Amino acid sequence: MRTDLGDGHAVVDLCEAALDDADRLVPKVRIMAMQQQAHGASLAGERGLVDQLIDQADRLLPSVDDDLPWGNACRRTPGYLEVQRATCYGRLGLGAEAGALWSQVLALVPETARRDRGVYMARQATAAAAAREPDQAVEIARSAATIAVETRSARMRRELVTLERTMRPWQDAPVGRDLAEILGPVTEGS
């Protein structure tokens, strides 16, 4: 919840407290705490800490071997930790780096995982806009918007609203008008 509120320092503090006695935690819980701490670090503008935490979590990933039914996204989701890194990079304003990671992640995510693919594409489009590549952002947004309309995903809609904000510098340009037309069906009735 502190991440959603943009309180990076509180997220880092909470995760540090959770990891204070990390040896007593199963690897899956340590990975979850580390990736959440990375999100907090991204909110605080600390790229080095983001990379350090995601890299540490990645080294723990092979140790996740329990059969508990909760918290298995780190094993089940292709490129899970790179999804977290790309999200953090996007939050840090590292558009080119985030975009490259989203390309890698999307190559791993099956077409059947439509909601995840749509969210990731919306984030990739936002990364392109942040990297001052508005044409690329709009091209990616076309696919994400189609999925958003078909699935009615609120999460995807939120990501596309973020894209819309990031594209404001081009709102009066042809590319901005194209984006508004593409996103129209997504935001109808919202």
Protein language model features and the residues they cover:
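Conserved binding/catalytic microenvironments
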Residues: M1-S190
